[in-house]
């Protein structure tokens, strides 16, 4: 039997105690071990015959295609998307430079290559005039007025702002429940500040689950990139620049506010 998540030795100690107390016999343990060894020995030949090489570039291209087909366009006011040639674009948001592309916890894997949206925008050949980047906010939610001021200053120089927001690895991970459905307060404050000086804001949202969107009226476009994998940023760039058309659909119902959800009356209670 495979036990997940890893028990950290608790189950081993329980088994040792059970053997000493006579509740479990060594023959019982041997029988379970034989089953595991049978699996190991019966699959060894197949593993040995498995291909030892693979095409990393082809895998990355497939990942980019899969991510692009999953991206959801939630809003596009005044046809602000796709971005247009000659348009002065400011990229703001920590997720543009350090992508949130996968879940946190035991699901995390080491990708051979990970796209960053900032690099993809800089390398784009659509004729967009990139005017600069600002992180805009602390990724883990701490207030940082200086970063926000830098972002607002940059937003004033652009025709359009691409604002990369989302849930960080500490707010959304295996082993914990989210305390709410909201974006971090510092991200919402940044959106307010940027929209106050430049109404042409495109929000690209990175998150593995729904977030409430009472702030959606303060951006002209809202694109849900989910957790797009190693090539998710490149796929997002393809969508934003019009190389590909967004065709993804939501797999969950999104509420504008937590008050709109049926769970509002129960969430946050004590016990079960």
Where are the model-predicted features located?
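Mid-to-C-terminal alpha-helical segments outside catalytic/metal-binding sites
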Residues: 26-44
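Catalytic center-proximal scaffold of phosphoryl-transfer enzymes
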Residues: 5
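C-terminal non-catalytic regions of proteins with extracellular/luminal or membrane-system context
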Residues: 8-24, 38, 53-57, 61-272
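N-terminal small/glycine-rich loop or linker at the start of catalytic domains
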Residues: 9, 44-45
């Amino acid at each position: 039997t495979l036990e997940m998540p890893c028990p950290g030795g608790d189950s081993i100690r329980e088994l040792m105690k059970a053997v000493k107390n006579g509740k479990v016999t060594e023959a019982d343990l041997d029988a379970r071990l034989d089953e595991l060894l049978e699996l190991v020995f019966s699959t060894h030949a197949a593993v040995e015959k498995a291909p030892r090489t693979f095409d990393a570039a082809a895998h990355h291209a497939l990942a980019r295609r899969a991510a692009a087909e999953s991206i959801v366009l939630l809003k596009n006011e005044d046809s602000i998307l796709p971005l247009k040639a000659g348009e002065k674009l400011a990229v703001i948001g920590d997720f543009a430079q350090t992508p949130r592309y996968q879940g946190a916890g035991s699901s995390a894997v080491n990708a051979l290559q990970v796209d960053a949206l900032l690099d993809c925008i800089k390398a784009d050949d659509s004729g967009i005039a990139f005017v600069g980047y600002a992180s805009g906010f602390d990724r883990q939610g701490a207030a940082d007025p200086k970063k926000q001021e830098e972002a607002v200053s940059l937003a004033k120089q652009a025709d359009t702002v691409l604002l990369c927001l989302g849930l960080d690895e500490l707010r959304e991970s295996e082993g914990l429940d989210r305390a709410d459905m909201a974006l971090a307060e510092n991200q919402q404050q940044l959106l307010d500040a940027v929209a106050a000086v430049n109404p042409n804001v495109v929000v690209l949202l990175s998150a593995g689950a729904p977030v409430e969107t009472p702030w959606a009226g303060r951006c002209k476009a809202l694109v849900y990139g989910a957790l797009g994998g190693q090539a998710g940023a490149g796929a997002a760039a393809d969508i934003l620049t019009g190389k590909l058309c967004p065709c993804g659909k939501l797999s969950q119902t999104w509420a504008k506010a937590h008050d709109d959800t049926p769970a509002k009356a129960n969430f946050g209670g004590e016990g079960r």
